[in-house]
A protein has these predicted regions:
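Broad hydrophobic/π-residue packing in well-ordered secondary structure
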Residues: 1, 27-28, 86-87
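Intrinsic-disorder/low-complexity, polar/charged segments enriched in Ser/Thr/Lys/Arg/Asp/Glu/Gln
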Residues: 1-4, 60-62
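Compact, glycine-rich, soluble single-domain proteins
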Residues: 6-49, 53-56
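C-terminal structural segments of small proteins and small subunits
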Residues: 51-89
Length: 89
């Protein structure tokens, strides 16, 4: 199962946004990977992995999980929602 989303976070996935995203991904009931479109996937719960993506505002990323069912859907929905925000708290 996968979802594609455009990063709306003004700072992109760097430093604090990357840490918050990794924390949110790690709290999900299923493992999730993230990749820039056409790039290699990394563990979405890994701050360093996320930072190596170099995803900036406007970049398209793919979120993917091997899981199925409601947990997988909810996990991807939550992470898409996070990336769709312009600012993170």
């Amino acid at each position: 199962m996968e979802r594609t989303v455009v990063v709306a976070i003004t700072e992109g996935l760097h430093a604090r946004p990357a840490a918050l995203f990794a924390q949110k991904a790690g709290a999900q009931p299923v493992p999730v990977q993230i990749a820039k479109t056409g790039g290699d996937p990394v563990d979405a719960a890994s701050i360093l992995g996320i930072m190596t993506l170099g995803a900036s505002v406007g970049d398209e990323v793919v979120l993917r999980t091997e899981a199925d069912g409601d947990d997988a859907t909810a996990a991807l929905d939550a992470l898409v929602e996070f990336l769709s925000q312009e600012a993170v708290a």
